[in-house]
C-alpha cells in the first residue's frame, strides 16, 4: 500500500507542478553548526508577493535550526524591525525561550539598529546571511520552498485562500519526518509524534 501511495503522489499533476526544481549551489558552502537544543538557534525570512488573503500578503517564516520546526505567521504587510521583534517574541520566544543566535537575510527589519539592539538586549547574536549567497540561510529557504509548494497544492482551486490554509502547511511540515534528524520536528521538540490526519 505504501508503494501505491507513493506512485499516486508522484503522478499527481498538481503536486508535480507545485514542486520546485533543486540544483546544487555553486561554490563551497559550509553548514552552520548544529545547535544543542531546540529553538536556541533560529533562522527567519519573509515571503512576499503573495495574493491578498484575508487581508494578508506576507508570511514571516521562523525555523528552529535544531529540530527543523517552523512557525509560519501571516501578515498584512512587511513589518518594521520593532514589529518583527514583537511578532517573534509573541510567536516563538515566549513559547520556546530566548535564542542564542538569529540568522536572517539583510532585509531592513534585520539589519536595523533596532533589531541589533533587541538582539543585544536578549543576549543573542544577530547573524546576517551573505547577500550573494542566500543559501547561507538555507534552512529557511528550504522551508520557504516546501511551504510554497504545499500551499500551491492546498489552494490550487482558490489561491487567495492561502492564509486560512497556512496553519495546515505549518502542521504538515512539523509532523513529517526530517531526513537530517530521522524524527519529525514535533517529535524532536516534544518527545512524541502527534497524530497525523485521520
Question: Where do the model's predicted regions map?
Answer:
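Integrase module of LTR retroelements
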Residues: 1-198
Amino acid at each position: 500500500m505504501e508503494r501505491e501511495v507513493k506512485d499516486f503522489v508522484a503522478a499527481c499533476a498538481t503536486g508535480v507542478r507545485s514542486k520546485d526544481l533543486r540544483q546544487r549551489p555553486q561554490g563551497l558552502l559550509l553548514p552552520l553548526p548544529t545547535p544543542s537544543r531546540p529553538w536556541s538557534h533560529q533562522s527567519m525570512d519573509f515571503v512576499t508577493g503573495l495574493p491578498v488573503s484575508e487581508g494578508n500578503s506576507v508570511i514571516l517564516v521562523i525555523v528552529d535550526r535544531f529540530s527543523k520546526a517552523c512557525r509560519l505567521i501571516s501578515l498584512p504587510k512587511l513589518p518594521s524591525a520593532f514589529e518583527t521583534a514583537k511578532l517573534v517574541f509573541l510567536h516563538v520566544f515566549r513559547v520556546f525561550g530566548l535564542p542564542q543566535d538569529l540568522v536572517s537575510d539583510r532585509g531592513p527589519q534585520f539589519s536595523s539598529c533596532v533589531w541589533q539592539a533587541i538582539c543585544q538586549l536578549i543576549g543573542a547574536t544577530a547573524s546576517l546571511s551573505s547577500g550573494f549567497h542566500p543559501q547561507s540561510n538555507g534552512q529557511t529557504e528550504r522551508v520557504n520552498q516546501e511551504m510554497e509548494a504545499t500551499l500551491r497544492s492546498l489552494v490550487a482551486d482558490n489561491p487567495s485562500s492561502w492564509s486560512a490554509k497556512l496553519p495546515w502547511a505549518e502542521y504538515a511540515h512539523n509532523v513529517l519526518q526530517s531526513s537530517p534528524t530521522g524524527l519529525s520536528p514535533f517529535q524532536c521538540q516534544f518527545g512524541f509524534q502527534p497524530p497525523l490526519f485521520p
